[in-house]
Protein backbone atom coordinates (compact mmCIF):
# COMPACT_ATOMS: atom_id res chain seq x y z
CA UNK A 1 0.00 0.00 0.00
CA UNK A 2 1.41 3.40 -0.90
CA UNK A 3 1.87 6.25 1.55
CA UNK A 4 -1.03 8.32 0.21
CA UNK A 5 -3.48 5.45 0.58
CA UNK A 6 -2.27 4.75 4.11
CA UNK A 7 -2.75 8.40 5.09
CA UNK A 8 -6.22 8.44 3.54
CA UNK A 9 -7.08 5.26 5.47
CA UNK A 10 -6.03 6.89 8.76
CA UNK A 11 -7.95 10.05 7.90
CA UNK A 12 -11.06 8.04 7.01
CA UNK A 13 -10.83 6.24 10.36
CA UNK A 14 -10.53 9.49 12.30
CA UNK A 15 -13.25 11.27 10.31
CA UNK A 16 -15.40 8.13 10.34
CA UNK A 17 -16.22 8.76 6.69
CA UNK A 18 -14.79 7.26 3.49
CA UNK A 19 -15.62 10.42 1.55
CA UNK A 20 -12.08 11.60 2.30
CA UNK A 21 -10.85 8.74 0.08
CA UNK A 22 -13.46 9.30 -2.62
CA UNK A 23 -12.94 13.08 -2.76
CA UNK A 24 -9.41 13.92 -1.57
CA UNK A 25 -9.97 17.63 -2.26
CA UNK A 26 -12.90 17.95 0.15
CA UNK A 27 -12.58 20.71 2.74
CA UNK A 28 -12.59 18.56 5.87
CA UNK A 29 -13.12 21.37 8.37
CA UNK A 30 -15.75 23.24 6.36
CA UNK A 31 -17.67 20.00 5.84
CA UNK A 32 -17.55 19.20 9.55
CA UNK A 33 -15.55 16.01 9.05
CA UNK A 34 -12.85 17.09 11.49
CA UNK A 35 -12.96 19.38 14.53
CA UNK A 36 -10.37 20.30 17.17
CA UNK A 37 -10.72 16.97 18.99
CA UNK A 38 -10.49 15.12 15.70
CA UNK A 39 -7.38 17.10 14.83
CA UNK A 40 -5.64 15.91 17.99
CA UNK A 41 -6.79 12.35 17.29
CA UNK A 42 -5.46 12.61 13.73
CA UNK A 43 -2.07 13.91 14.83
CA UNK A 44 -1.74 11.09 17.38
CA UNK A 45 -2.74 8.51 14.77
CA UNK A 46 -0.17 9.93 12.33
CA UNK A 47 2.54 9.77 14.97
CA UNK A 48 1.63 6.19 15.94
CA UNK A 49 1.22 4.87 12.38
CA UNK A 50 4.01 6.70 10.55
CA UNK A 51 6.31 7.89 13.35
CA UNK A 52 5.88 11.46 12.11
CA UNK A 53 5.56 14.07 14.85
CA UNK A 54 3.41 17.05 13.88
CA UNK A 55 3.28 19.58 16.72
CA UNK A 56 -0.20 21.03 17.14
CA UNK A 57 1.38 24.48 16.75
CA UNK A 58 2.48 23.49 13.23
CA UNK A 59 -1.01 22.33 12.23
CA UNK A 60 -2.58 25.19 10.27
CA UNK A 61 -6.17 24.49 9.19
CA UNK A 62 -5.66 26.61 6.09
CA UNK A 63 -2.80 24.37 4.98
CA UNK A 64 -4.05 21.00 6.26
CA UNK A 65 -7.58 21.56 4.94
CA UNK A 66 -7.97 18.69 2.45
CA UNK A 67 -6.87 15.04 2.39
CA UNK A 68 -4.51 15.79 -0.52
CA UNK A 69 -2.92 18.68 1.39
CA UNK A 70 -2.49 16.47 4.45
CA UNK A 71 -0.72 13.84 2.34
CA UNK A 72 1.53 16.53 0.84
CA UNK A 73 2.41 18.00 4.24
CA UNK A 74 3.21 14.58 5.68
CA UNK A 75 5.30 13.66 2.64
CA UNK A 76 7.47 16.68 3.34
CA UNK A 77 7.85 15.71 7.00
CA UNK A 78 8.66 12.01 6.60
Curated annotation (Swiss-Prot):
PROSITE patterns, A to Z: CARRIER
Keywords: Cell wall biogenesis/degradation, Cytoplasm, Phosphopantetheine, Phosphoprotein
Pathway, per record: Cell wall biogenesis; lipoteichoic acid biosynthesis
Gene Ontology CC terms: cytoplasm
Gene Ontology annotations of biological process type: cell wall organization; lipoteichoic acid biosynthetic process
SUPFAM superfamilies: ACP-like
Modified residues (O-(pantetheine 4'-phosphoryl)serine): 36
Domain of life of the source: Bacteria
Entries under InterPro entries matching the protein: ACP-like_sf, DltC, PP-bd_ACP
Molecular function terms, GO-annotated: D-alanyl carrier activity
PTM entry text: 4'-phosphopantetheine is transferred from CoA to a specific serine of apo-DCP.
Function: Carrier protein involved in the D-alanylation of lipoteichoic acid (LTA). The loading of thioester-linked D-alanine onto DltC is catalyzed by D-alanine--D-alanyl carrier protein ligase DltA. The DltC-carried D-alanyl group is further transferred to cell membrane phosphatidylglycerol (PG) by forming an ester bond, probably catalyzed by DltD. D-alanylation of LTA plays an important role in modulating the properties of the cell wall in Gram-positive bacteria, influencing the net charge of the cell wall.
Family: Belongs to the DltC family.
HAMAP family the record matches: DltC
NCBIfam families noted in UniProt: dltC (TIGR01688), PRK05087.1 (NF003464)
Protein name: D-alanyl carrier protein
Gene assigned in the entry: dltC
Amino acid sequence: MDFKQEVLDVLAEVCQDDIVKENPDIEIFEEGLLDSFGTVELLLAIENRFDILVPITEFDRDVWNTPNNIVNQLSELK
